[in-house]
Amino acid sequence: MKIFFIRHGETTGDVENRYGGDYNDHLSEKGKQQSLNLSRNLSSKGIEIIYSSPLIRAQETSITLSTQLQCEIITIPNLKERNQYGILTGMNKDEAKQKYPNEVELLKDRLNTVEKAESYEDFSKRLADAFDEIVDNSKYVAIAIVAHGGPLRVLFRDILKWGEISDLGDCAYVELEKIDKKFKLIHSEGFNRNFQIPS
C-alpha cells in the first residue's frame, strides 16, 4: 500500500497571523493555488481515495485533489489538528501576547497544555488510532490522507518513531509504502527531517 500523508495549503489565518490549531479557517488564494499545484504533481500516482480531516482548510485541499484525481473523500474526525492553543485559538498572535502572556509562554513546550486545550498525549493517541484505522482497514492500493502539520509531526515522532521534522511548509507531503507491517519512506516534500530512516 502507498500512503500519501499531506498537509493542507496556506490559510487565511496564516495570512492574518492567527493561532491555528483547530481554528476553522479557509484556504487563502495562495493556499488554493498550492493545492492545485499539488494535485497536478500527484495526478500520476494512482491515488484511489482521500481520507480528510473535517476542518475546512483540509476539506478545501481535499476537494481540489479529488477533482483532479477523480476519487472519493472520506472525512475522518480524528484527523483534525490538535486544539493546541485553547483560549488563544483564532487570536492574532500579537494581541494574544498582550492579553495572555503566560499562556503564550506555555506554548514553547508542546507538552504544556494551555487553558481549554487538548493535551499532547490525547492528541497523539487519537492520531495513532486514526492512522491505524485507515491503514489497517483500507482496501485500496494507494491512498491520500489530508490533514495538518501536527498530525504529520506525530506520524514521524510517535507513530513511526523515526524522529523530528522541521520547517514544515504548506502542502508538504510524505509518500510511504507499507510492506507487511513495516513502512518505507519513498519521497518527501516541503519539510526537513533531522534523522536517518531506519533500514
Regions found by a protein language model. Give the residues of each.
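Generic beta-sheet signal
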Residues: 3, 139-149
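Loop-to-helix element that buttresses phosphate recognition and phosphoryl-transfer chemistry
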Residues: 7-61, 115-127
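Phosphate-coordination/substrate-recognition cap region in phosphate-metabolizing enzymes
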Residues: 39-100, 104
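Glycine-rich phosphate-binding loop signature in dinucleotide/nucleotide-binding domains
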Residues: 44-46, 134-141
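Short glycine/proline- and acidic residue-enriched helix-loop micro-motifs
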Residues: 101-122
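GST superfamily/GST-like fold recognition
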Residues: 149-153, 172
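Domain-level recognition of soluble alpha/beta enzyme cores
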Residues: 162-184
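Short, solvent-exposed aromatic-acidic interface loops
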Residues: 186-197
